[in-house]
Amino acid sequence: MAEAAAPGTTATTSGAAAAAAVAAASPTLTPTVASQSPAAGGGGGGSGGGWTKQVTCRYFMHGVCKKGNNCRYSHDLSTSQSAMVCRYYQRGCCAYGDRCRYEHTKPLKREEVTAANLAAKSDLPASSSLPALVEPLAEVSTGEAESVNSNFAAAGAGGEDWVNAIEFVPGQPYCGRAAPSCTEAPLQGMVIEEELEKQQTNVEMKKQLCPYAAVGECRYGENCVYLHGDACDMCGLQVLHPVDAAQRSQHIKSCIEAHEKDMELSFAVQRSKDMVCGICMEVVYEKANPSERRFGILSNCNHTYCLKCIRKWRSAKQFESKIIKSCPECRITSNFVIPSEYWVEEKEEKQKLIQKYKEAMSNKPCRYFDEGRGSCPFGGNCFYKHAYPDGRREEPQRQKVGTSNRYRAQRRNRFWELIEERESSNPFDNDEDEVVTFELGEMLLMLLAAGGDDDLTDPEDEWDLFHDELEDYYDLDL
């Protein structure tokens, strides 16, 4: 034994070299070491045992294994554990059911995954195979056994507390084997949990709200693939996203705006329901014909009239224009009669109503302009839209500069002559009614655009008054 160990053995001989030397010197221990080496090294090929028989053959699972019984992997699906998990079963939609060739297992939770990792680490061969080799070697030689034991002890330092070792996480600093003294391990766990929570939050934010649950009619309930939102206190619908704060604030803001509009509408109905027309003396909202339940708002006074009565009053022919344009009660002239479904009395609200009325008129095409084929007597000051077939708007005409006072006086005299002629006779008795209307409008535009110290007027209300007079007198729909 001394001759076999002396030539190539020193005090620092490795464990593997010592094991080989002992096996060569002692013939009784050779079968033991030889029988353990195949198990430790993974066994040979063929149909023999070994760790390969614990792994299911993937080719056999698909029915295409060419080796048959000579395959070194397991062909028994009942005793071996499948490495292929059915992803459709995990989603709850596997069509094969029990006939599926893949394993039907539910996805593990975070705690179960951690326990499985610890159980897998406990099956490492380092803690079981190495002591098994040390014990038979210790019986051969005391000196060599001591060197082998010292080498194995040096190689396996800290093997007793390997269960408490820190799990290596890519991207995180490694703490080494001093797991109990490492203060960064709890922090790493907290960081990982926060990242997982952020990922789950992002997934929840990407989910869409169920449109059926928003109206309270989702038949799937908790099994719905869409997200069921929280109920809104304003509208009572499940439309608030549980995670998306921006969506929640936006919906609440829109609900508040809608609630304010509803309140304004309620107040308008409340102040309008008891208003009585000053001409027919009937409550406007209680008229038999629903189409007559509308107010005619005068621009310069706050007296109440229904639209039908005030229009009939202002279309009378037996009175002067100043009389029919004035209020029947206070005699204040108003250039506008604005149709309204609700009664408006405040000045600011009335201005908004007038502006809205003008905007509505500007969207209707002018029948006299006729998309450029005709001529409107009011030109660019017409309430209605002057547009060509291609959508272009009519450009306003430039005012004539340098017109003499004598020419303006002649045009003004001609204008008043036409007014007197209109009062003395009906211009619709002949076929030149349109010509008279256009000529009258042209002269009116000339008077307004002439400028100078002796202009007729330049306030916008006066121009609206002329427009209203022409429309009512000639029964035109300007």
From Swiss-Prot:
Q: Which SMART domains match?
A: RING, ZnF_C3H1
EC supergroup of this enzyme: transferase
Recorded catalytic reaction(s): these are:
S-ubiquitinyl-[E2 ubiquitin-conjugating enzyme]-L-cysteine + [acceptor protein]-L-lysine = [E2 ubiquitin-conjugating enzyme]-L-cysteine + N(6)-ubiquitinyl-[acceptor protein]-L-lysine
InterPro entries xref list: DHS-like_NAD/FAD-binding_dom, MKRN-like, MKRN1_C, Znf-CCCH_4, Znf_C3HC4_RING-type, Znf_CCCH, Znf_CCCH_sf, Znf_RING
**Superkingdom assignment:** Eukaryota
Q: How is it modified after translation?
A: Auto-ubiquitinated; which leads to proteasomal degradation.
Q: List where this protein forms a coiled coil.
A: none
Assembly and partners are described as: Interacts with p53/TP53 and CDKN1A. Interacts with TERT, modulating telomere length homeostasis.
Q: Briefly, what is this protein's role?
A: E3 ubiquitin ligase catalyzing the covalent attachment of ubiquitin moieties onto substrate proteins. These substrates include FILIP1, p53/TP53, CDKN1A and TERT. Keeps cells alive by suppressing p53/TP53 under normal conditions, but stimulates apoptosis by repressing CDKN1A under stress conditions. Acts as a negative regulator of telomerase. Has negative and positive effects on RNA polymerase II-dependent transcription.
Q: Could you tell me what this protein is called?
A: E3 ubiquitin-protein ligase makorin-1
Species source reads Notamacropus eugenii
